[in-house]
Amino acid sequence: MAAPKSAVRKPRRKDKKNIAVGQAHIKSTFNNTIVSITDPTGAVISWASSGVVGYNGSRKSTPFAAQLAAESAARQAQEHGMKKVDVFVKGPGSGRETAIRSLQAAGLEVGSINDVTPQAHNGCRPPKRRRV
């Protein structure tokens, strides 16, 4: 009979990558803001979102939650030696500019800022108007 496997798994150790230049992808929707910091090839080094930082519901869509998410992602990336990022912003949300500013405030040098928001050429039907 085979020996039983232990129920406790060892957490995988994150090895330190030494990457000085990378990309910051900020996806800002009406409900949330997600910040991913990648190396130049696109492999994710660190990420954070408004929900991971500790906000729920409508508070996730605030600029302050986006600021905290960007600071958290920048801190993790700096542990891997990141110093300079090119920023790619996607989406119409309220946390766009705040996230870029907090990346700079966290100590990352921002090289360029590109808006990569997708534009539909008459694709999906948009959501209905709100009746408040």
Swiss-Prot record:
Keyword set includes Ribonucleoprotein: yes
UniProt key word Transcription: no
Basic residues compositional bias, start-end: 7-16
GO CC terms of this entry: ribonucleoprotein complex; ribosome
Keywords recorded for this protein, A-Z: Ribonucleoprotein, Ribosomal protein, RNA-binding, rRNA-binding
InterPro entries per the UniProt record, alphabetical: Ribosomal_uS11 (IPR001971), Ribosomal_uS11_bac-type (IPR019981), Ribosomal_uS11_CS (IPR018102), Ribosomal_uS11_sf (IPR036967)
Pfam families in alphabetical order: Ribosomal_S11
Biological processes, Gene Ontology terms: translation
A GO molecular-function annotation: structural constituent of ribosome
Region (Disordered): 1-21
The protein's assembly and partners: Part of the 30S ribosomal subunit. Interacts with proteins S7 and S18. Binds to IF-3.
Family from the record: Belongs to the universal ribosomal protein uS11 family.
Entry protein name: Small ribosomal subunit protein uS11
